[in-house]
Structure formats: structure tokens, C-alpha cells
Regions:
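Alpha-helical transmembrane segments and their immediate juxtamembrane cytosolic regions
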Residues: 1-237
Length: 237
């Protein structure tokens, strides 16, 4: 949460692709957030007692986070008005990733699926996730994490392999330095050693992250307006 907040604050206060070493350092540390979320979804799916409610919670916050995220970064609330990329927050592909885990999981799923059907559905989920923050990679990486539970080395290296494709797109289409920074997800490795694989006992924790995520984006959006924008930027553009 600290890494994510620092990263978003840096993007709000110093927008663009500044090359100051300390700014790059903040964004590098911010790469901790995404893989942590992917681990959270894989473990949340594994330990949830009610998958339907878990999915409903993710969907509700995906909708709320869409408006908060776009407000924070000045992205139009009208999808695809300016771009097909980065049109909504990472909560949307996390929601799709949870569906992907259910599709993959022959034990929990209440209906049979052949392998080609599972592959086809996962491709559709990736397509639906494509316009969001981190694109389709939360779907792919979360599934990889779930498939390799108990093998942290394989989980992390697999994520890095997937993110290599994301880095290539960044480097070719946006910015080389910031593209390479995406490899910073690997710094999650030592932190994941502290997770013991058990379900947390604090009931409030299942709500805290989502509420904090939406709330901090709104506050960053207000800060953006104060520093850089005017009332028209509430709607992006």
C-alpha cells in the first residue's frame, strides 16, 4: 500500500516521464504493488469461503475504482475517447483474473469444461482486460501464481517472463526507461517470503484495501486539480 501510494503521488505531483534518479526510484518501488495484488487475488481465491461474494466485491470496487482512477489521472470517463490503453484501474483485470481462476479450477467449478473451452474463455478475459492498467497481464500472472502455489521462485520468474512482453510494448510505444522499470516487479520476491500461506483472521482487512485504493485515488485526483488542472479535467482531457 505504501509503495502504491508513493507511486501514485509521484505521478500526480510530477506527471510525465521525468528522469530524475529519485523519481525513477519512487516508481521502481511502486512496482511492488501490482504483483502483490496478483498474489492477493490468487490467495484470496484459494481461501475465500464464498467465491460468489468475493467476485461481487471485486466487481463493485472495479466500478468504483474506474471513476476514481480516471479522475486521479485525468483520463476521460468515456471509454476509448482518447486511447484504447489504460482506460480503467487494475481492479478490473483483478476481477477478471478471479474469474479466470474459477475457469481453470476443475475442483471448485460447478460445471465441466474442456481444455479448449478454458483456453478460449481465458483469451476472452485477456481481451476484456486489455484496455486497463497493466493490460491483460494481471489475468495471466495471477493464473500463473495460482498454478505454481508453494513455488515462489517459479511464481516470480514466470511473472517476469510475462511482463517482458509488457516491457517491450512500453519501450517501443511509450518510454524506454519507464518500460524497463516494469521489471521492478521482481523486488516483490523477498517480501513474499514473509507470507505463510494462511488465511488472515482480521475480517476488516478484506474491505480495507479496496476502500483505501479508491479513497487514495480520489485524494490524488483532488491534488492533481489543485496543482495542474481545472474543473474540466474532472472528466479527463
Amino acid at each position: 500500500i505504501i509503495a502504491m501510494t508513493a507511486d501514485h503521488l509521484a505521478s500526480t505531483i510530477w506527471p510525465g516521464y521525468g528522469k530524475e534518479w529519485w523519481l525513477l526510484g519512487i516508481h521502481l518501488i511502486g512496482r511492488l504493488a501490482a504483483p502483490t495484488m496478483w498474489f492477493m487475488i490468487a490467495e484470496g481465491y484459494q481461501h475465500t469461503r464464498n467465491f460468489k461474494k468475493y467476485l461481487q466485491r471485486l466487481f463493485i470496487f472495479a466500478v468504483l475504482a474506474h471513476f476514481a482512477y480516471n479522475f486521479c489521472f485525468g483520463i476521460s470517463l468515456i471509454p476509448f475517447r482518447d486511447s484504447v490503453l489504460n482506460q480503467t484501474s487494475v481492479i478490473w483485470p483483478l476481477f477478471l483474473a478471479a474469474i479466470g481462476l474459477y475457469i481453470y479450477d476443475d475442483e471448485k467449478r460447478s460445471f465441466p469444461l474442456k481444455n479448449w473451452q478454458k483456453t478460449a474463455i481465458l483469451l476472452v478475459l485477456c481481451l476484456l482486460a486489455f484496455p486497463s492498467d497493466w493490460s491483460c497481464f494481471p489475468v495471466l500472472c495471477t493464473l500463473h501464481i495460482y498454478q505454481n502455489r508453494g513455488n515462489l521462485r517459479k511464481q516470480v520468474l514466470g511473472m517476469v517472463a510475462y511482463i517482458s512482453m509488457y516491457v517491450i510494448v512500453w519501450c517501443l510505444c511509450i518510454d524506454v526507461v519507464y518500460g524497463l522499470i516494469q521489471f521492478g516487479i521482481i523486488i516483490v520476491w523477498p517480501f513474499m517470503h514473509f507470507y505463510n500461506g494462511t488465511r488472515g483472521k482480521a475480517r476488516w482487512m478484506k474491505w480495507f484495501f479496496y476502500v483505501f485504493y479508491v479513497g487514495h485515488l480520489v485524494l490524488c485526483g483532488i491534488l492533481r486539480l489543485i496543482l495542474h488542472g481545472n474543473v474540466t479535467t474532472i472528466f479527463g482531457g
